[in-house]
């Protein structure tokens, strides 16, 4: 079931969490639902943006902040033009996330979480194993800090909730903001 968009007002939906928590999976699934319902949607994935817009940046705190600020600039620009922007980026530092989201016309901060043992099991690239062996320096959640949101708009435990359950929570949050009306994934 889908309906016509309620508004042309844009929004930044910022998915934050550790690698493997499900940020990109959720953003892709939500984008599909919203696009099928006629909403203007763009996805900004942290890995893709880092490869193209932030090529050459490392993983120091300064470089990570620069990367997040770049993503935020693009996201906020699109949102100001009526686009629902779905950002999936680890974005480990609270202060930088808050700074970027403060500039958004409207925002929804989504904390995507799963326990470390689950993230390690999900890790098909073996990045966590390498980080735990010390082969990857500055790996968020292992040798570099991740500061979870203190008061996210939506908190999704992907180890306890299915993808459809997570989508239900996200759609309900978008409905509360009067961004969408009754978009269904069933």
Curated annotation (Swiss-Prot):
Pathway(s) annotated for this protein in UniProt: Sulfur metabolism; hydrogen sulfide biosynthesis; sulfite from sulfate: step 2/3
Active-site residue numbers: 91 (phosphoserine intermediate)
Name of the protein in question: Adenylyl-sulfate kinase
Family statement: Belongs to the APS kinase family.
EC number: 2.7.1.25
Pfam families linked: APS_kinase
Cellular component terms (Gene Ontology): cytoplasm
Gene transcribed to yield this protein: cysC
UniProt GO molecular function: adenylylsulfate kinase activity; ATP binding; sulfate adenylyltransferase (ATP) activity
Function: Catalyzes the synthesis of activated sulfate.
Keywords for this protein: ATP-binding, Kinase, Nucleotide-binding, Phosphoprotein, Transferase
Residues annotated to bind ATP: 17-24
Domain of life: Bacteria
Primary enzyme class: transferase
CDD domains: APSK
